[in-house]
Amino acid sequence: MNRFKLSLLALIASLSVSTMGASIDHIQNYSAEYGGNPAQQGAINVGSTVYFNPAGLMRLENGTYIVGGIQYAFGDQNMSQGGRDFSTNLSSPIPNFALYKKTDDGAYFWTMGGVGGGAELEYKDSIPLSVNLLGNSIDFNKFLSNTHVKGSNIYAQTTLGKAFNLTDKWSASLAVRGVYGKRTLKANATVDKNVNIGDLIGKPLLRIPIFREGTASIDSEREAYGFGGQFGLNYAPNDRLNIGFRYDTKVKMKFKTKSDINDNTYGQSINIPGMSIPSLGVSDALLGLYPVYKDGEKLRRDLPALAALGASYKVTEQWTTFVGGNYYFNESATMDRIGKTNVDYKNGWEISVGSEYWFTPQIAWLVGFNYADTGAPDKSFAATEYALNSTMLGTGVKYRPNETVEWTVAFNHYIYDSRTVNDIKYEKEISSIGINFVKKF
């Protein structure tokens, strides 16, 4: 029977997904400029280097810089099974802020913004609830009504550090990172009439209620704080080529759950030859026995380490090209467990290319491409999330009205690979638009 409970729980938990995840919980859209050109790992510019290549700050002009922006993600996510669609629209603002001061002796920097998670997802008309029970495939949506599920998953990060020159060509950066994570889940369902075990296994004369007529609901919130480090290197062998590297350490995060469960659907325990089932309520099947959402539960779900490497090359005075990649060390991170079951995540990776062309000293055009392999195995789709591989296409415009101000507006679209796991087809389609502002003093 535990397998039955956990199967339903896994489907409910699919709400906790990263909206534009590069790999599992991670996102990379730290600034709007990423939306127009995601290959920022080796870039030198005033609006995004502080986020993606902080060691490269030593290649900028001396001064104090303030960076601020916001991105707005929108789209839909869809699960389908047996000809029925379970979809939700999403919308999410993603703000970013940075302050840094560059001198000949070094650069001090501070950033704030999103580092993982995504938008709130709300399924107003249930989700797939087909479960294998005692050799039969049971669609529990036939017995439940008013099933409503809403979940969110947000990680915010602040970084404080310093960049400094090693030689006239090499520079480095060191920083500390603080991460706050919050994952919420609300669910409710109604049992319209008693659900007998005989109805589930094709023996209508066995009229023992496994669920009774009633309602069940859960309101769960998980929070965690964690700290990590960040190390960077930048190499500029000449005026045209620049190579950047950044390593973000794993952030250990122990989530503590506060949960309020109300359930009057508990059925009768069953103990007959060949069948032993304890008294159950819908909350048990949905969430109650899932350790992640039990009140007072403390479980690790780390933010995995990340290595980023990239380069930029100035082809002409007006045109710069970019290439970069990220590698996510998911296998070394401790993730949520369902009882004693652990999902073996694979390491994830991304590759990006981009271009920036200045038509005039005031206006530039950005364009870029990114492919992400999340490292999420099929098994995870029946556990805690569905992190689909994706292709991102982006474009944008930079505007410099004078030497101390820069605006960036960008748009991107994510094309996700659909995947079918246990007869459930998972799909996403997400876009975002963003604006970024830089002021130099």
PLM region spans:
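Residue-level signature of outer-membrane beta-barrel architecture
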Residues: M58, K101-T103, K162-F164, F231, ...
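Extracellular loop and loop/strand-boundary signature of outer-membrane beta-barrel proteins
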Residues: S80-D85, K142-H148, G214-S220, Y293-E297, ...
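Transmembrane beta-barrel strands of outer-membrane/channel proteins
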Residues: G68-Y72, W110-G114, L174-Y180, F245-T249, ...
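Residues that define the transmembrane beta-barrel architecture of outer-membrane proteins
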Residues: S48-V50, N89-P95, S152-T158, E223-G229, ...
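Solvent-exposed loop segments that connect transmembrane elements
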Residues: K124-S145, R183-D219, F255-G296, A333-N342
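N-terminal, post-signal peptide beta-strand-biased segments of exported outer-membrane/organellar beta-barrel
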Residues: V17-E120, T384-Y386
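Repeated loop/turn-to-beta-strand initiation elements of outer-membrane beta-barrel proteins
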Residues: T64, D105-Y108, K169-A172, R240-I243, ...
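Outer-membrane beta-barrel "beta-signal"
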Residues: V397-P401, K428-F441
